Curated annotation (Swiss-Prot):
Pfam families attached to this UniProt entry: Mob_synth_C, Radical_SAM
Role this protein plays: Catalyzes the cyclization of GTP to (8S)-3',8-cyclo-7,8-dihydroguanosine 5'-triphosphate.
Chain residues that bind GTP: 16, 66, 97, 158, 260-262
Organism: Synechococcus sp. (strain ATCC 27144 / PCC 6301 / SAUG 1402/1) (Anacystis nidulans)
An individual GO BP term: Mo-molybdopterin cofactor biosynthetic process
GO molecular function: 4 iron, 4 sulfur cluster binding; cyclic pyranopterin monophosphate synthase activity; GTP 3',8'-cyclase activity; GTP binding; metal ion binding; S-adenosyl-L-methionine binding
The enzyme's E.C. designation: 4.1.99.22
Entry binding sites for [4Fe-4S] cluster 2: 255, 258, 272
Pathway where this protein functions: Cofactor biosynthesis; molybdopterin biosynthesis
Protein name in the entry: GTP 3',8-cyclase
Reactions that this protein is recorded to catalyse: GTP + AH2 + S-adenosyl-L-methionine = (8S)-3',8-cyclo-7,8-dihydroguanosine 5'-triphosphate + 5'-deoxyadenosine + L-methionine + A + H(+)
Keyword Kinase: no
Cysteine pairings via disulfide bonds: none
Length: 327
């Protein structure tokens, strides 16, 4: 089997596919200026195009697909997309990242269609603080989706919280206590600077090392990562059912274990979340007979993947916000 690899000896088995660039939340760290979309932008990838895309990437060794947004539940055909992706031979895991606003009543259908992992964005366990961060009053709906996911016993259930120095770090102990009796993983993501959130970043950035130092002192132990795992380092504790984790893009050598590629909701391959430029794959997603051309295009494009991002130098590439690419 072909395994995608770049010039930096990194293998890629994980694809993040954005299903839409539209989001119905207005998180300060992501869309501080609101969402400004080009009305003339191309249409979203269709279900047949998505199927051709996944089949092509599986032929290149991809084993895990994460469906992101924007907010992917805004797609009315989401269940059909999950079913199509899960049906491709070679796919070991189908994951979904969602803000959970309209997820609870769709979870059973998504699980039946083949969803094996859910990552729910939840930046606070307090309704008022949640609204202050996200601009949404749907806290109860998100919590209901989380409890439903626990009840359905999804194989992998994770909560993502962007680490914010003044807005949720003071409630860190609440998150830790939340996993004591719940079989979920809560991962804190270091706030990343984009072209739109400079002031917010300056106010709210906090290094993830602050958390890991506390956890290690409290007896939490690091867990070995799977080869298709995302960038999080997770920790377990004998007194807790759940896990804690940190995604620290500002840490040294963060990019040396990169194992994922991104495709936008319009069919463009993006080599790095904080890179520049995209490579349009859509012309090779129209018919199965184009498979060899698609594979060749992906392999050639991978030659342009750099060794790492330049976030530490305050260089966000051309990324205005994270909603466009799904983070």
């Amino acid at each position: 089997m072909i395994v995608l690899a770049d010039h930096h000896d990194r293998q890629f088995r994980y694809l993040r596919l954005s299903l839409t660039d539209v989001c119905n939340f207005r998180c300060g760290y992501c869309l501080p200026k609101g969402q400004q979309l080009d009305p003339q932008r191309p249409a979203l990838l269709t279900l047949p195009e998505i199927r051709h895309l996944i089949e092509g990437f599986v032929a290149l060794g991809i084993e895990k697909v994460r469906l992101t947004g924007g907010e992917p539940t805004l797609r009315s055909d989401l269940v059909d997309i999950v079913r199509a992706v899960a049906a491709v031979p070679g796919i070991r895991r189908v994951a979904l990242t969602s803000n959970g606003w309209n997820l609870r009543d769709r979870l059973a259908d998504l699980q039946a269609a083949g969803l094996t992992q859910l990552n729910l964005s939840l930046d606070s366990l307090d309704a008022a603080r949640f609204q202050a961060i996200t601009g949404s009053s749907r806290f109860e709906a998100v919590m209901a989706a989380l409890e439903q996911a626990i009840a359905l016993r999804l194989p992998i259930l994770k909560v993502n919280a962007v680490l914010l120095k003044t807005l949720n770090y003071p409630q860190l102990s609440d998150f830790v206590e939340f996993v004591r009796d719940r079989p979920i993983s809560i991962r804190f993501i270091e706030l990343m600077q984009t072209l739109d959130n400079h002031d917010y970043f300056q106010q709210e950035f906090l290094s993830g090392s602050v958390l890991t130092e506390q956890w290690l002192a409290q007896g939490w132990q690091p867990i070995k990562r799977d080869r298709t795992a995302g960038p999080a380092q997770e920790y377990c504790h004998p007194n807790y059912q759940g896990k804690l984790g940190i995604i620290a893009p500002y840490s040294p050598n963060f990019c040396q274990n990169c194992n994922r590629l991104r495709v936008t909701s319009r069919g463009a391959l993006r080599l790095c979340l904080f890179g520049t430029g995209e490579f349009d794959l859509r012309p090779w997603l129209q018919h199965p007979d184009q498979r060899s051309q698609l594979l060749e295009q992906v392999q050639q494009t991978l030659n342009f993947k750099t060794a790492g991002h330049q976030l530490a130098e305050a260089n966000s590439g051309d990324t205005r916000n994270l909603a466009t690419y799904g983070g």
